[in-house]
Amino acid sequence: MARALLFSLVFLAILLPALAACPQNCHCHGDLQHVICDKVGLQKIPKVSETTKLLNLQRNNFPVLAANSFRTMPNLVSLHLQHCNIREVAAGAFRGLKQLIYLYLSHNDIRVLRAGAFDDLTELTYLYLDHNKVSELPRGLLSPLVNLFILQLNNNKIRELRAGAFQGAKDLRWLYLSENALSSLQPGSLDDVENLAKFHLDKNQLSSYPSAALSKLRVVEELKLSHNPLKSIPDNAFQSFGRYLETLWLDNTNLEKFSDAAFSGVTTLKHVHLDNNRLNQLPSSFPFDNLETLTLTNNPWKCTCQLRGLRRWLEAKASRPDATCSSPAKFKGQRIRDTDALRSCKSPTKRSKKAGRH
């Protein structure tokens, strides 16, 4: 009898995690592997089965995520905490979540991310922190995130990127910093994420192109700098990743000029957005060879022979942008692709291939 009772107790102990109850007012699926507690009035993190892999806690109220808030959920893969009025994430808040891949913290009131907030998240691949009030990234904050691939930090209040901000996140590929308050990227701030492929910096306050910081990047395919008061782009701006750059957004920047060698080393550019600026010329280094899309409208283009490369590109395209001349006066309002201003322009003398090799 005693042996039978002992066997029963052991059996129940083994099954207990799988038989744990679904939290009140929540919906559970797949033997409690998916727990949905969306907008159910929770004030504290509920207890769930150790077998739970997806926990959706959206639209509840957790002002502070304290240390060890999820320690009893070692098998979580996806954690949803959007719209939860979170103000602070304490050090060790996600301790124990060594299987977590997706973490959603979007649309909260997060102002403080303590160093150590992401400890133990060594498998985390997707981190969404957009639409919060984060003003700085403490050095070492991302150090545990050795597998991070996508980081969304858009729509926050970050003013500056300092050296070491992304320390440890060496595999980061997509970084979104749109709609912050960035006025500068310090030299060294991107040294730890040289493998970025997609980098969005639009709608910030960058008054000069951050050459020193960006020069550490090697494989950027898409760079978005729209809606920054840039005015000019310097020589060799994209050279360190010029063999990979395919899409460049520089619209709505009050851009007045490119330096002559701004596009030096750029060989694969396919899509460029330059509309709503103050440009009147394009540099001789502008890479038309592989270009598929070019937006040009609302710029005061000066229709002289310096635009002959643009004219040739426009003539070769079936779908062509409708940019017009602003000067000389007699050509004002004429489409660049049709104006007589460029008809007599001769092609520049090509340098020999031998002379052009490096």
Swiss-Prot record:
LRR repeat extents: 51-72, 75-96, 99-120, 123-144, 147-168, 171-192, 195-216, 219-240, 244-265, 268-289
Tissue expression remark: Cartilage.
Compositionally biased spans, kind Basic residues: 348-358
Main location: secreted
Summary of the function given for this chain in its UniProt record: Promotes attachment of chondrocytes, fibroblasts, and osteoblasts. This binding is mediated (at least for chondrocytes and fibroblasts) by the integrin alpha(2)beta(1). May play an important role in the regulation of chondrocyte growth and proliferation.
Subunit structure and binding partners: Mostly monomeric. Interacts with collagen type II.
Family: Belongs to the small leucine-rich proteoglycan (SLRP) family. SLRP class IV subfamily.
Protein name: Chondroadherin
